[in-house]
């Protein structure tokens, strides 16, 4: 096999979402050296980067923070289940308090050891992003599949979920932004708590983030990024947020074209204003130019600053245990087949994610009575909302060939990937520093033309979402939805739906958390979402047909091609090729105490029991307008502050 072919497999940029799964297995049979390519040395650092490389260190003995596994009568003030986005933030903040003892239970391990550079190099994001049938790494992902999705031609979708320290911050697209001010006002209204308004959220957003502005690294003159300094704090941290070192060439063309459609320039999508266009920030360390995760930030600092945190890796939570007063007092766990328990003196906090937090609630006796009784689980608290209200969206759009360099070259280009690896190893420059999507725009639905909706659907959106909440998110995706393997340059003008009405669920058919839960997002099950999907696609196509983008587009639309014109044809293409946003929320939703569908109160406490909270994306009452990672970090900061304050 040619070296260029092996290198191409090693990089696995945007893998075309679905068609990659159809590639011949013979291709993969010849890649025994793939691991060495992925784990090739990552080159020299400058002096500043060398000091910030995220190595695992501790205040005292590093080993004091791990285990001991299986010993009886281990007891901590707080026991946190899940070492992901929220779990590690909670663990750091609670362990900072003198006298607090904290245990963190994580089913996975360290992603650096389990997945190599696939989790470190920004553009290697897509190495295991999709299940193509030939390359899997169950060490750091749960390999969860959905029920057949009727709205997506009955596809059973792989749903990426991190099983590692860092959780999905080690798996996702690194996109960092915040919701609109109206979204957080809606949150405050739905849970009956004014501490969820934008002004009250902002300090929690600021506390966790160490922002490096666009001048940290040089940017092209035609790729100006503007930020609202009031959105950030100079004392924030530990999570690095910055712009990728490389600016995608196509992004400046999209930026210029959208001027003609009336898009205003906004200040980075983190000051509560989304409607408009901007380059977008990522959780990338601007000095090492590597992925930043909850593990490389919160955990690394906690290990150095505190002796109050114990971590149990490769340890699966089986269920939460309660005393006679329905107070959570322990977590039953399993390590390599051995069952034991970790006791909690104050609280148990579930941060296992949108699928596994509701699963743990149900196997512990908290959930819909009918579901629990079918599995002979004693009902501790009948909460019909557990596992319900799942919300996520999809990403879709047309693909065009272009005359400027794009990440699609990495698939099949004989020279592009070796050059990019050399650039990254020796200079921390080039295509591998950017995960392939750095320019976004948000828009309300139009009143007429492409992007417009029926009066009925538009009225439903207006009635259910705030005025500053966008209908669509547009993304200049520097690659293809279906891989081409020819080394040519393509880009996909993509869209995600922000005002969806489809609602799915998470359930169980087993009492064993070793078994994956049942997950049914029900994408495009609501006709209004189907209408929005077609309208968003047509709007993307309208952008690419503008004269400015025609100057850089090299020929006719590649996918789906101009023969797809009717609504049914476009919807069919979307159903076959669109992918998950991997941003599910809402399956253990906050709400008012008198709401029978609420699972949590506004302090993230599970209703009907004591000493148990859920803090992660499942806690959201609804999907906010955009990527949830920034809000999950802030929610963890907020609830940790509540706990420390005695709430």
UniProtKB/Swiss-Prot annotation:
Induction: Expression is positively regulated by the dothistromin-specific transcription factors aflR and aflJ. Dothistromin biosynthetic proteins are co-regulated, showing a high level of expression at ealy exponential phase with a subsequent decline in older cultures. Its EC number is 4.2.1.143, 4.2.1.142. One of its GO terms (biological process) is secondary metabolite biosynthetic process. Its main location: cytoplasm. InterPro entries: FAD/NAD-bd_sf, GMC_OxRdtase, GMC_OxRdtase_N, GMC_OxRtase_C. It is found in: Cytoplasm, Cytosol. FAD binds at residues 85-86, 106-107, 172-175, 617, 628-629. SUPFAM superfamilies: FAD-linked reductases, C-terminal domain (SSF54373), FAD/NAD(P)-binding domain (SSF51905). It catalyses: (2S-3S)-versiconal hemiacetal = versicolorin B + H2O; (S)-5'-oxoaverantin + H(+) = (1'S,5'S)-averufin + H2O. Disruption phenotype: Impairs the production of dothistromin. GO terms for molecular function: flavin adenine dinucleotide binding; oxidoreductase activity, acting on CH-OH group of donors; versicolorin B synthase activity. Pathway: Mycotoxin biosynthesis. The keyword Glycoprotein applies. GO terms for cellular component: cytosol. The keyword Glycoprotein applies. Glycans are attached at residues 117, 222, 509. Residues 1-26 form the signal peptide. Its cofactor is FAD. Pfam families: GMC_oxred_C (PF05199), GMC_oxred_N (PF00732). Keywords: Cytoplasm, FAD, Flavoprotein, Glycoprotein, Lyase, Signal. It is an enzyme of class 4 (lyase). Homodimer. PANTHER family: DEHYDROGENASE PKFF-RELATED, GLUCOSE-METHANOL-CHOLINE GMC OXIDOREDUCTASE. Versicolorin B synthase; part of the fragmented gene cluster that mediates the biosynthesis of dothistromin (DOTH), a polyketide toxin very similar in structure to the aflatoxin precursor, versicolorin B. The first step of the pathway is the conversion of acetate to norsolorinic acid (NOR) and requires the fatty acid synthase subunits hexA and hexB, as well as the polyketide synthase pksA. PksA combines a hexanoyl starter unit and 7 malonyl-CoA extender units to synthesize the precursor NOR. Belongs to the GMC oxidoreductase family. This is Versicolorin B synthase.
């Amino acid at each position: 096999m040619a070296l260029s072919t092996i290198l191409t497999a090693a990089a696995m940029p945007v893998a075309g979402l679905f068609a990659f799964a159809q590639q011949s297995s013979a291709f993969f049979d010849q890649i025994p050296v793939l691991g060495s390519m992925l784990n090739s040395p990552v080159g020299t650092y400058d002096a500043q980067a060398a000091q910030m490389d995220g190595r695992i260190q501790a205040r005292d003995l590093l080993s004091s923070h791990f285990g001991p596994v299986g010993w009886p009568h281990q007891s901590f003030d707080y026991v946190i289940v899940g070492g992901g986005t929220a779990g590690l933030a909670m663990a750091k903040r609670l362990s900072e308090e003198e006298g607090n003892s904290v245990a963190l239970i994580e089913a996975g391990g360290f992603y650096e050891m389990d997945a190599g550079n696939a989790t470190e190099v920004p553009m290697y994001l897509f190495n295991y992003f999709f299940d193509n049938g030939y390359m899997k790494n169950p060490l750091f992902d749960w390999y969860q599949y959905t029920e057949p999705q009727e709205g997506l031609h009955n596809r059973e979708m792989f749903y990426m979920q991190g099983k590692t320290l860092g959780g999905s911050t080690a798996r996702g697209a690194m996109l960092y932004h915040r919701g609109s001010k109206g979204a957080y006002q809606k949150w405050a209204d739905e849970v009956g708590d004014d501490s969820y308004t934008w002004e009250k959220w902002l300090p929690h957003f600021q506390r966790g983030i160490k922002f490096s502005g666009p001048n940290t690294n040089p940017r092209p003159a035609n790729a100006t990024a503007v930020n609202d300094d009031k959105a950030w704090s100079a004392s924030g941290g530990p999570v690095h947020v910055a712009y990728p070192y490389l600016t995608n060439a196509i992004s400046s063309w999209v930026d210029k074209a959208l001027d003609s459609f009336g898009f205003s320039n906004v200040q980075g999508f983190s000051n509560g204003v989304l409607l408009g266009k901007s380059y977008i920030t990522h959780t990338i360390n601007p000095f090492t130019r590597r992925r930043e995760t909850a593990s490389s930030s919160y955990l690394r600092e906690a290990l150095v600053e505190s002796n109050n945190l114990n971590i149990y890796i490769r340890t699966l939570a089986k269920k939460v245990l309660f005393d006679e007063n329905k107070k959570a007092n322990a977590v039953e766990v399993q390590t390599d087949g051995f069952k034991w328990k970790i006791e909690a003196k104050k609280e148990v906090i579930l941060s296992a994610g949108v699928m596994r937090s509701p699963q743990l609630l149900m196997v512990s006796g908290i959930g819909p009575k009918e579901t629990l009784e079918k599995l002979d689980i004693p009902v501790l608290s009948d909460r019909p909302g557990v596992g319900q209200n799942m919300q996520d969206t999809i990403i879709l759009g047309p693909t065009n060939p272009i005359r400027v360099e794009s990440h699609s070259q990495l698939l099949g280009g004989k020279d592009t990937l070796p050059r990019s690896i050399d650039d990254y190893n020796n200079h921390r420059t080039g295509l591998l520093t950017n995960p392939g999507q750095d320019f976004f725009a948000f828009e309300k639905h139009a009143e007429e033309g492409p992007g417009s909706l029926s009066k009925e659907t538009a009225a439903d959106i207006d009635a259910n979402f705030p005025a500053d909440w966008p209908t669509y998110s547009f993304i200049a995706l520097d690659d293809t939805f279906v891989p081409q393997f020819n080394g040519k340059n393509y880009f996909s003008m993509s869209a995600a739906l922000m005002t969806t009405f489809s609602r799915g669920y998470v359930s169980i058919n087993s009492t064993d958390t070793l078994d994956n839960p049942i997950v049914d997002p029900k994408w495009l099950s609501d006709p209004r979402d189907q209408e929005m999907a077609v309208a968003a696609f047509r709007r993307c196509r309208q952008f690419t047909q503008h004269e400015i983008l025609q100057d850089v587009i090299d020929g006719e639309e590649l996918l789906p091609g101009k023969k797809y014109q009717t609504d049914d044809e476009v919807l069919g293409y979307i159903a076959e090729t669109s992918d998950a946003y991997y941003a599910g929320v809402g399956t253990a939703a906050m709400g008012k105490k008198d709401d029978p569908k609420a699972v949590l109160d506004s302090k993230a406490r599970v209703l009907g029991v004591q000493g148990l909270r859920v803090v992660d994306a499942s806690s959201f009452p609804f999907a906010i307008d955009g990527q949830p990672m920034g809000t999950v970090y802030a929610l963890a900061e907020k609830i940790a502050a509540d706990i420390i304050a005695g709430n």
